[in-house]
């Protein structure tokens, strides 16, 4: 029986962990960029066998757990390390009376989906990720939404974490002018605008699209808002497939996975 344990990561673990967080996606990985923020937030769990071979970050809010950044050293795949890390994160959530656990998995990632299924996570919703290029664009008419129905936004995305909305959360967002809408011919598109806490100059938008004309209004506003406020990129997350719009680029689809803990 070889020595192994789960513990909180520390500053000195960085290099040994980043070694296996290099080529996760075709473009690389984001772990290096968020490393110090996640360390500050705490609950960055590390699986150690002589040296670190896996990590997973958990974010606890209201009554939910958000699980993110599961990375396993390729030499230690199929050792159930991901499952053990997730189960550990859940156990801390349960002690603190959290009711649900969520994670986001690329719809093509069969291994992660079966790992989540084996831990009783269900495919709850599908979300699509688009990027939009910031640029000067005055071709819009939008309004700030004063009161928004939680049926339009059951979740909003805060720094790539799907947070279940409450009346209070939506009221706070609208009082900060973070919720915009375009309303034409009885159809409307709404968007919640946020910053990516861990990566600079990135606008994250949760979008609910009603028609092409209202969508165009909102996308044009977002482009211009990002341009005027020196954002480098706009990341849009939505349940629907969006129609063609200049410099809107479909990236990838995800399953929002959900597990009840009670």
What are these regions (language model features)?
Residues 119-199:
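Amide-forming acyltransferase catalytic core, primarily the GNAT-like/NAT-type
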Residues 22, 28-45, 54-70, 191-200:
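A conserved beta-strand-loop-helix scaffold within acyl/acetyltransferase catalytic domains
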Residues 83, 107-125, 240-252:
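Conserved active-site alpha-helix within GNAT-family acetyltransferase domains
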Residues 72, 78-91, 114, 213-224:
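Conserved acetyl-CoA-binding loop-helix of GNAT-fold acetyltransferases
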Residues 1-11, 134-147, 262:
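Conserved N-terminal entry element of GNAT/NAT acetyltransferase domains
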Residues 50-54, 111, 188-190:
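Glycine-rich acetyl-CoA-binding "A-motif" of GNAT/NAT acetyltransferases
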Residues 93-108, 228-238:
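Conserved GNAT acetyl-CoA-binding A-motif
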């Amino acid at each position: 029986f070889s020595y192994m344990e789960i513990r909180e990561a520390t500053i000195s673990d960085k290099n040994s962990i980043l070694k296996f967080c290099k080529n996760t996606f075709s473009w690389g990985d984001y772990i290096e960029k968020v490393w110090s923020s996640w360390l500050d937030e705490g609950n960055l769990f590390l699986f150690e066998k002589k040296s670190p071979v896996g990590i997973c970050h958990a974010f606890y809010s209201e009554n939910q757990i958000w699980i993110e950044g599961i990375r396993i050293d390729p030499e230690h795949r199929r050792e159930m390390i991901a499952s053990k890390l997730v189960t550990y994160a859940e156990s801390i959530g349960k002690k603190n009376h959290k009711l649900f656990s969520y994670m986001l998995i690329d719809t093509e990632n069969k291994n992660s989906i079966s790992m989540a299924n084996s831990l009783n996570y269900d495919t709850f919703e599908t979300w699509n990720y688009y990027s939009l290029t910031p640029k000067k664009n005055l071709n819009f008419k939008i309004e700030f939404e004063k009161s928004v129905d939680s049926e339009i936004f059951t979740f909003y995305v805060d720094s790539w974490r799907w947070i279940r909305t409450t009346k209070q959360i939506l009221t706070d967002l609208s009082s900060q002018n973070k919720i915009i809408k375009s309303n034409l011919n009885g159809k409307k598109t709404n968007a919640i605008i946020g910053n990516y806490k861990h990566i600079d100059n990135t606008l994250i938008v949760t979008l609910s699209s009603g028609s092409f004309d209202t969508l165009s209004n909102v996308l044009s506003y977002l482009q211009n808002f990002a341009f005027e406020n020196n954002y480098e990129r706009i990341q849009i997350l939505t349940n629907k497939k969006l129609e063609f719009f200049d410099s809107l680029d479909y990236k990838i689809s995800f399953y929002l996975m959900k597990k009840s803990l009670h």
